[in-house]
Amino acid sequence: MSQNQETRGFQSEVKQLLQLMIHSLYSNKEIFLRELISNASDAADKLRFKALSNPALYEGDGDLRVRVSFDADKGTITISDNGIGMTREQVIDHLGTIAKSGTKEFLTALGQDQAKNSQLIGQFGVGFYSAFIVADKVTVKTRAAGEEADKAVLWESAGEGEYSVADIEKKSRGTDVILHLREDEKEFLNEWRLREIIGKYSDHIGLPVEMLTKEYDDEGKECGEKWEKINKSDALWTRSKNDVSDEEYKAFYKHLSHDFVDPVTWAHNKVEGNQAYTSLLYVPAKAPWDLFNREHKHGLKLYVQRVFIMDDAEQFMPNYLRFMRGLIDSNDLPLNVSREILQDNKITAALRKALTKRSLQMLEKLAKDDAEKYLKFWKEFGLVLKEGPAEDFANKETIAKLLRFASTHNDGSEQTVSLEDYILRMKEGQKAIYYITADSYVAAKNSPHLELFNKKGIEVLLLSDRIDEWMLSYLTEFDGKQLQSITKADLDLGDLADKESETQKQQDKAFGSFIERVKNLLGERVKTVRLTHNLTDTPAVVSTDNDQMTTQMAKLFAAAGQPVPEVKYTFELNPEHYLVKKVADIADETEFADWVELLLEQAMLAERGSLENPAAFIKRINKLLG
């Protein structure tokens, strides 16, 4: 029987909040249960802390738990706890106003030193109102620890701007939250649906969550019901890593990620200091199918004192590490009004920095300890890691060590060569790391620009991923060595360059008039025309200057629908090649023009993989062959 009943209006902020809740402030409805179980966990934590100095508050019942039940006929779900409970004044303050769930005031009252150990969560206390996402009426029955049974409180609201509060009798300490579900939310009146949600969100809180289960006699006949713990209530990451087996880590990864394959590696760390947190990070073995989809969700699971707050907390990991899986569990993270969107602040930034460093250390260790495993990882996630130099300047050198490339040192197209490997094999006097970018490994491997390097035995990295050119615009040096494209017209081999011979000087002089004829013929279509002594088997190539956009970068711009600046090539001719010698001797201007055009088109085709007018090219070949 209720007494001393009164009806009150919600604080104006609460009215706004309820409207947001009812219209799905949260991204999915089922988290109402997570929030209410989280509140029950709060209540248990508060009781544990206060009972340290006043054990009588346990009232002979120190086995704290939360119980979830439902009544399909009445259309209700009840979440009950035997935690700290609330007085009438606390109910009015905490359920009638926003940002006063009690946790923040509780911490202030205790003082910061004690609060460090209190394991309390939340700053805003809006989780309770999430009940109105699925309920058109909410009833709360609560009695504060240490109060008489007739000092309990009844609170009810339909979420429409006001609530009622009255005195009732309640024998047991704690709080019962009864949700009267909307007609279209009856899917939650199902034991297995509730078990699924509890397993998903509350498996690893440090409080048993119980549901009623049927009991059967020896003959298999139903003989009653009993409360059964349905969550693990054992946060694996809070245990010492020395007490967790590899199999447990692997099983937890699969539980966490819903992956069927064992992870490649993992790291479990507990950090204390200005920020106290625990992280458990995993490197998956296989890339998800939508890894490069912009809508792909990624990030870590966020827990606050073992209470699951959100999936895909991307604030803690840079985009180029979006393949990392795992969790972070912290007690002092600030949360916004919905507890699903982290505030952008110094704590978040510091955690991101630390977790990024930890992830890169994991990959460094894997590469060092098990090269074969690392190469398997690279095949799955290498393209993503190549985004790193552009995104993370502070860790650029570390990321660069993790990159792998195909190379002229090896026969196959597999990307197995690190920049450190390359430097160890550099020629005496070599000052740069040389590379070439192309549309494919085959195109890079057979580029005429490689001829001189093959002749001198200088290793060249063969880059054919679309992202490579963009990556190299940010990764310009490593370990004090410049990364240099061999397709540049102003390529400088330094001490490795051949000294100009007397023969070359004579050739330059003899072909002077020929070069002028070609310049006059091509005019503004090329930047310049010159002889080159860097080719062995090819008559001509085109190249760009260092200050010009490369061919591959221009292709990236075009593929992205961006305007592409005009690229004017330097046309380089090999005076040792019989075709160039033949063309130089042609007197007829028409025939001369056809042959020069053919040499230019061949060079352009080798460089770009396509021509603006392939029909004219074919026609010219047929004409000269006829």
From Swiss-Prot:
Gene Ontology CC: one annotated term: cytoplasm
UniProt keyword list: ATP-binding, Chaperone, Cytoplasm, Nucleotide-binding, Stress response
Domain of life: Bacteria
Region C, residue ranges: 556-626
CDD domains with a match to the protein in the record: HATPase_Hsp90-like
Keyword field contains Cytoplasm: yes
Localization in the cell: Cytoplasm
InterPro entries: HATPase_C_sf (IPR036890), Heat_shock_protein_90_CS (IPR019805), HSP90_C (IPR037196), Hsp90_fam (IPR001404), Hsp90_N (IPR020575), Ribosomal_Su5_D2-typ_SF (IPR020568)
Main subcellular location of this protein, as a coarse class: cytoplasm
Function: Molecular chaperone. Has ATPase activity.
Oligomer and partners: Homodimer.
Family membership: Belongs to the heat shock protein 90 family.
Protein name in UniProt: Chaperone protein HtpG
Native source species: Haemophilus influenzae (strain 86-028NP)
